Amino acid sequence: RAAKFGIPHVRVPHKDEDRMIELFKVWRVDLIVLAGYMRVIKNPAAFPCPIINVHPSLLPKYKGLNVVERAMEAGDKETGCTVHYVNEELDGGEIILQGKVPILPDDTIESLTKAIQRMEYGILPAAIEYVKNSRQSNHVDNAKYQLQESNS
């Protein structure tokens, strides 16, 4: 997709973090955004800039994989998504922004996943803007924001 939009790109095996770090330094990357990146960054502190991730649950609840299924199996009334900073702990970094999604009685894993993805599309740009503004002012107030999806 990057080529389609004229964005410089290169494929690097996910296990070669040293090469990724090197490229991000050369390209002077300001922010790394993980969306659908189902890998663990082993040493996030070695990267030259912040890394944020969008995760399909309301962290700190349901870290890791299969989180939509786990929320449904637990009988939760709502779930959602979280954008957070990546640190050494899996899905354990500081929360930037969360969006809540109700779990409806007739929801399936597929329908709930789609509802969460719609919320992710809404909060990820806002989270990126928040990180950008925080870095420009050299001040992070640790505010947690939440959005709510309607039942429509």
Task: Describe the predicted segments one by one.
Residues 1-152:
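One-carbon transfer enzymes
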